[in-house]
A protein has these predicted regions:
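Short, electropositive alpha-helical surface patch
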Residues: 109-122
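Small-aliphatic-rich amphipathic alpha-helix that forms the alpha element of a beta-alpha
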Residues: 14-15, 56, 71-112
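C-terminal helix-cap and adjacent tail motif
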Residues: 124-150
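Short secondary-structure boundary segments
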Residues: 60, 103, 129
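A short beta-loop-alpha structural element at the N-terminal edge
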Residues: 1-5
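Residue-level "edge-of-site" marker
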Residues: 27, 104-106, 123
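Glycine/small-residue-rich phosphate/adenosyl-binding loop
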Residues: 6, 11-12, 16-83
Length: 150
């Protein structure tokens, strides 16, 4: 993805995502350099993943996230997930494909990228142009399986 404006648009959409009490406990790492891509790929080394031209890593910071008083639930992960979905939706809107990845080694990531103890990676979103003939297709559950009207 050579068009920096597309990446800027995607990040702007993520930046504007809602968060609990508007605390915005996230940080976005846009990985474009070959050296940093290699560091990232050590954390999740799959053939399809290593071909992506750009990655956005969504990190959360529990120290600045809202915490629900009734049960001490920290909302950093939830807020980061909302921002991650904004990334995926923005990418689709401008004709890019994305894949939200959580099956990576977060400790190796923190070591490779020197994250502070409070900041941690929640998701890696690979971005690129969609193949004309995709390698695989996913199925979705029928609406009747997942929706209850009350």
């Amino acid at each position: 993805i050579r068009d920096r404006d597309k990446i800027d648009y995607i990040i702007e959409c993520a930046r504007l995502a809602p968060s609990a009490v508007n605390y915005q406990p996230w940080h976005f790492m846009v990985v474009v350099s070959e050296e940093q891509k290699q560091n990232l790929r050590q954390c999740y080394n799959r053939e399809w993943f290593v071909r992506a031209p750009v990655y956005i890593v969504v990190c959360a910071d529990k120290s600045i996230a809202w915490v629900r008083k009734s049960d001490n639930k920290n909302h950093a992960d939830i807020d980061a997930a909302i921002a991650t979905e904004h990334i995926c939706l923005a990418a689709a809107e401008i004709g890019l494909g994305s894949c939200w990845v959580c099956n990576f080694d977060p400790e190796l990531f923190k070591a490779n990228f020197g994250l502070s103890s409070e900041r941690y990676p929640v998701a890696i979103v690979s971005l690129g142009y969609i193949q004309e003939q995709p390698d695989h297709f996913t199925t979705r559950k029928d609406k009747d399986e997942i929706v209850t009207f009350l």
